[in-house]
Amino acid sequence: MRVADIFMSFPSIVLILVLVAVIGPSIWSVTIVIGVLGWTQFARLIYANVLSVSEKEYVESARAIGTSNYKIITRYILPNSFAPILIAITFQMASAILMESSLSFLGMGVQPPGASWGNMLYDAQSITVLSKRLWIWMPPGIALLITVLSINFLGDGIRDALDPKIKI
């Protein structure tokens, strides 16, 4: 966990900018760097969930009656740790989309022949385009907004569906 703590102590955008500058801006380098730096949150979440579930009374009672560690892990710990991880994956996807768009907007992501919402928004920086040519920046901005909100709503729905404490 100390390695994850070290990675999490630096702002992710700074690390991503440095690594993309070293590797070179392309869709593959951005995807790999965002994926490689995203593991720390999942490692922290999995570690905390496994510790929390392993301290529950039903796990301790299974240990008390002599259930094997393999059976405890597969029957109790993994199924009860799966829901928070699935929810975190959906939120991480939305964050990765925003990060890629931000990097493309800054010129460190997908290069201009390639299509990216960040590149499309970068093309609409002048006041003339912003005020008189709405069709240049409005569709990519709205598409980005709808995509990220949809993924976040999907994560909320999964959380509500998998959380046994919520009463309908």
Question: What is the meaning of each model-derived region?
Answer:
Residues 1-168:
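Alpha-helical transmembrane segments of integral membrane proteins
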